[in-house]
């Protein structure tokens, strides 16, 4: 049994290119930290402002999701105009629990019921 996290940075289009690059770098660093913290965790950024994660310990999924949300909510773009617009928003998150057919970092592939569930739930938010 696996847990997956699907997330979308809300209002990312209001960020400047430099601010979006900075946010992506912070998210990548956070995902690396989560990999060290939770055995069996793998996360990636897709489509520029979306996040997909899988972990083999569903009990830790909510905590990992809150860490990601906290990172995005605490992000302060250096551009004041970006900051005013962006601070109203954050991260939409959905967690799916289920089986996974494929988890392959080398192919950058996640496939299975859990990722479908979190993806569908996110699209309904």
Language-model features: where?
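Regulatory and interdomain segments flanking nucleotide-handling catalytic cores
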Residues: 1-125
């Amino acid at each position: 049994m696996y847990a997956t996290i699907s997330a979308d940075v809300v209002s990312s289009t209001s960020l400047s290119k430099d601010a979006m690059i900075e946010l992506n770098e912070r998210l990548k660093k956070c995902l690396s930290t989560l990999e060290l913290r939770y055995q069996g965790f793998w996360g990636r950024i897709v489509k520029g402002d979306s996040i997909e994660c899988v972990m083999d310990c569903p009990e830790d999924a909510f905590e990992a999701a809150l860490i990601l949300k906290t990172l995005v909510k605490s992000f302060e773009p250096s551009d004041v105009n970006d900051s005013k617009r962006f601070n109203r928003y954050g991260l939409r998150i959905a967690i799916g629990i289920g089986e996974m057919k494929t988890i392959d970092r080398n192919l950058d592939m996640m496939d299975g019921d859990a990722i479908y569930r979190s993806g569908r739930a996110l699209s309904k938010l």
